[in-house]
Amino acid sequence: MESSLRIVAITNCPAGIAHTYMVAEALEQKARSLGHTIKVETQGSSGVENRLSSEEIAAADYVILATGRGLSGDDRARFAGKKVYEIAISQALKNIDQIFSELPTNSQLFAADSGVKLGKQEVQSGSVMSHLMAGVSAALPFVIGGGILVALANMLVQFGLPYTDMSKGAPSFTWVVESIGYLGFTFMIPIMGAYIASSIADKPAFAPAFLVCYLANDKALLGTQSGAGFLGAVVLGLAIGYFVFWFRKVRLGKALQPLLGSMLIPFVTLLVFGVLTYYVIGPVMSDLMGGLLHFLNTIPPSMKFAAAFLVGAMLAFDMGGPINKTAWFFCFSLLEKHIYDWYAIVGVVALMPPVAAGLATFIAPKLFTRQEKEAASSAIVVGATVATEPAIPYALAAPLPMITANTLAGGITGVLVIAFGIKRLAPGLGIFDPLIGLMSPVGSFYLVLAIGLALNISFIIVLKGLWLRRKAKAAQQELVHEH
């Protein structure tokens, strides 16, 4: 590769908390070590930071897009005519060297209307999962803000403040705060569906998807026992997104073309999907959601524990990867229906791999390298706020023992969370969630967390010790054979 390249990059992930900034830092460090100049735009939970200007993009030799929730059409249009290397953000951290070595051969030339591949790269830039994660990322602030308000109202009631609703006269302050909080959960579903659709087809899909998903989730309007919930958001968001994506390709002539996006697409899409949702999609999705809720509420304990083990194991298995995200999405989506115990598994298990790895370096330092020991304190602090990604470097160094230890401990801890009846109202601050009212009971949370960490650390020490001894023995035998 030629020396002193000018590179620009964008990083984003569904939560916008850990991967976004860790990958940005890794890209910057690697570029500097190779003598390149780089600027990375981060699209995290705090919004867009270090935004790339059109001049910087124009001057760049290559563009790196490490994304977990996709990019809007407007964002992608910024790179028309540029050589672009795309990679899933969950893969970027472990393949930093590969990214830079493959820039000349595996980049894509973005045309104004479509991407034309130059190299061998096979990247699904618009995968269904990336669209779903765009919806989840947009819904997070609604749930976080709403969940904290609901928790605050509950805490105020526990401190003795009155709780009266409108049916008993003037509502109390605690009722008002709680009601505002529940609005976050109410709008979580239409926002999720709207951003799924707009991730596929940009702004013209946003309004129809928002309104139709709101309709699908309103059981009073539909006359059903349950709203469509996250199932409706996923199905309708994807359907409307792809419908509008196709609709935008219609050519009406110069005089009428400007009306397509502003008038025809919203009108036709809302009419078609609004009617379909009222008579068909809404009732069907509502029945499915009602069946799922009934199953979760009446599931036998043995089966519930088995499911909890599976969810916990999935959350700990690939630390922010697709398996983790699938389990996380399932648990998160149930919050809107006020089912909080499954999301409590996320609140405990997600922080265990990095914290356990960090603590294990202090307990058994001989099992870890100097770099791993130096990163231990950071892994503990960052991991304690439910950012699982700091565990990735430890897993890359010793995949079999670390992933096995995390998965076993995660599964067992998932069972304990359900057994102790722990609930989590919304995403928060990890280990501090009980202190701000987001997780309860407080004592059960810290007890289960302590047990889970003890198991995780024990598994790491035993399994990695065996793995290192076996590795050393194999190396010694190979040395003997050579002589």
Curated annotation (Swiss-Prot):
It is found in: Cell inner membrane. Keywords: Cell inner membrane, Cell membrane, Kinase, Membrane, Phosphoprotein, Phosphotransferase system, Sugar transport, Transferase, Transmembrane, Transmembrane helix, Transport. Its main location: membrane. It catalyses: D-fructose(out) + N(pros)-phospho-L-histidyl-[protein] = D-fructose 1-phosphate(in) + L-histidyl-[protein]. The modification Phosphocysteine is found at C13. GO terms for molecular function: carbohydrate:proton symporter activity; kinase activity; protein-N(PI)-phosphohistidine-fructose phosphotransferase system transporter activity; protein-phosphocysteine-sugar phosphotransferase activity. It is a multi-pass membrane protein. The active site is at C13. Its EC number is 2.7.1.202. One of its GO terms (cellular component) is plasma membrane. InterPro entries: Bacterial_PTS_Sugar_Transport, PTS_EIIB-like_sf, PTS_EIIB_2, PTS_EIIB_2/3, PTS_EIIC, PTS_EIIC_2, PTS_IIB_fruc, PTS_IIC_fruc. This is Fructose-like PTS system EIIBC component. The gene is frvB.
